[in-house]
Amino acid sequence: MASPCAQFSPCHCHATKDSLNTVTDVRHCLTEYILWVSHRWTHRESAGPLYRLLISFRIDAMELFGSELKEFSNSLPWDNIDNCVEIIKCFIRNDSMKTAKELCAIIGLCTQSAIVTGRVFNDKYIDILLMLRKILNENDYLTLLDHILTAKY
C-alpha cells in the first residue's frame, strides 16, 4: 500500500496565470491538475492561485449541470468515454464554439469527478483525461487560455 508523499506538487500547482502561454501549456496544466486533484493525499488548501481558479470552476459546473453536481458526476458513465461525451454535449449550446462559461463548467465537472472521497482510489482520472481530450478542441483550449489570462484571482 502506498503512503502519502511529503508533497505532491505538479509544476503548475503553485503557478500563476503567467505560466500559461500556449495551448500546449493549457493541455499540460489540465493534465497535471486532474492528476493532482485525484491524488488521495492532495491538500486542496495548498493549491496555488491557478489551481484555486480551476477548483472554483465547480461553481460554473453547478450552474450548467445542476446543483446536485456530485450526484450528476457519479451518474456519468466515465468508463464509456463516447457516451460520457455525448451526455455532456447535451448541455452545450454549440459544441464547435463552446463559451468560456461552458468550458469552465466542464473543467468543474471533471474536478468534482476526479476528487477521491474517503480512502477509495480508482483510475477514473484516466477516463476523465480521455474525455477531456475528446470533448475539447483547439479553439476550446484557446478560449480557456484567454479566460484564465483575463480572470481576476
Swiss-Prot record:
<dbReference type="InterPro" id="IPR011212">
    <property type="entry name" value="Poxvirus_B14/B22/C16"/>
</dbReference>
<dbReference type="InterPro" id="IPR043018">
    <property type="entry name" value="Poxvirus_sf"/>
</dbReference>
<protein>
    <recommendedName>
        <fullName>Protein OPG005</fullName>
    </recommendedName>
</protein>
<dbReference type="InterPro" id="IPR022819">
    <property type="entry name" value="Poxvirus_Bcl-2-like"/>
</dbReference>
<dbReference type="Pfam" id="PF06227">
    <property type="entry name" value="Poxv_Bcl-2-like"/>
</dbReference>
